[in-house]
Amino acid sequence: MIADRRTGAVLSLNARTRIGVVAGCALVLLAACGEPAQSASAAASTSAVSAPAHGSSAPKDSVPRTDAAPPPITYVPHPDTLRGLYVNRWAALGNSMWKLIDIAKRTEINALVIDVKDDRGLVLYKSRVPLAQKIGADSNRPMSQRRLAALFDSLRANNIYPIARIVVAKDPLLAGQKLEWAIKRRADGKPWLDKNGHPWLDPTQPAVWQYAIDLAREAHDVGFSEVQFDYVRFPDDDRMVREASFPLAHGRTRAQVIHDQLGAVRDSLKSDKMPMTIDVFGLTATDTTDMGIGQRWEMFIDRADVVLPMVYPSHFAPGTYGLGSPNAHPYTTIDRVLKDMKRRTTGLKNAAAIVPWYQDFTLGPPAYGAAQVRAQIKAGYDNGFYSWILWNPGSKYHTDALEAQ
């Protein structure tokens, strides 16, 4: 079993993998708030992704590369040690955005990971990417141009490093409108649906990744210093393995597909001079299989500049590392998983930097507060991991866990 990182709802995992997640209650999401739409940024310029072996060409909806030089953009430089917070779409659109910037001004926080495309497929601002416009991804209360400019003015003024989070495969909006890009059922060729009744994009489709590339380039043109790709995987659902068909896999394993696609994305973005980073399950450091989702440590660790494992103690089952409740032992759990990461990475060529995601939310007992958050951070420091990012699905954090600036 494994828990969905956004809601905390427990999901099933491939039967071979039993390190999964303890069952728990769903976390509360923020209510929608925002501003009316205006034009967002200078046009994103892209080139088609280099299709991996056995792949097909990029879609017609990708943005054409132009020769016109974009206006100069001042990018916030990468901090020597990154300490960040996740900012969901609704927090970015509301007053919470300014509160989170204020937290960064007062504490050790120096980076914000902001949803540019969330796991519903919604884009934060009015997009110049034709496909985003066509499917209405940017039409649900997008951030206004004025607010977007004010946001980046504030981030630059306070030297806060902005990271654009772009969800790749979990996009029910696009999968529902581009059925040819959705995962299909083997039995009848209709879209495969997860347990919530939502379709997923097929990770074997190069067009799926091209859309993410187009949005990444646009985010960079808007002013984001870095792009972070999430859901770079197959669905974590036993039924998918039994029911779904992937014609473009051409005999490749799920892990090989993810390896190939990440490599193609990285090659495509090299000329854009922005770091490529990916989120992965924290369990990948300990589990030696791909867990049914296509994420196997040795096959993705050299496919990005930075890998961000989600090492939430609540996501480790009772008995893992000999702990009756890993969630009740945040220091020990993080200490053990980070040691596994170091062991799995030692000796590998071109391995990415590792920046762990830590848990600042409650999923099962005990309730998490400043002490539990700080225990995770200390475990990281004791293992030589000095950069980190905190995750709370509602973007509400225990500021007393953060050191003053």
Regions found by a protein language model. Name each.
Residues 109-143, 236, 242, 402:
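Aromatic-lined carbohydrate-binding/catalytic grooves of carbohydrate-active enzymes
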Residues 163-171, 228, 254-293, 349-362:
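Aromatic-lined carbohydrate-recognition surfaces of secreted/lumenal glycan-active proteins
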Residues 98-122, 221-226, 303-306, 380-387:
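Catalytic domains of carbohydrate-active enzymes, especially glycoside hydrolases
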Residues 75-88, 92, 153, 169-221:
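Active-site-adjacent "subsite" loops/lids of carbohydrate-active enzymes
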Residues 110-116, 144-193, 228-229:
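Glycine-rich, aromatic-flanked loop segments that form ligand/cofactor-binding clefts
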Residues 304-318, 327-405:
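Substrate-binding cleft of secreted/luminal carbohydrate-active enzymes
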Residues 124-135, 171-194, 235-249, 295, ...:
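Aromatic- and acidic-residue-enriched segments that line the glycan-binding/catalytic groove
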Residues 33-36:
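Bacterial signal peptide processing site
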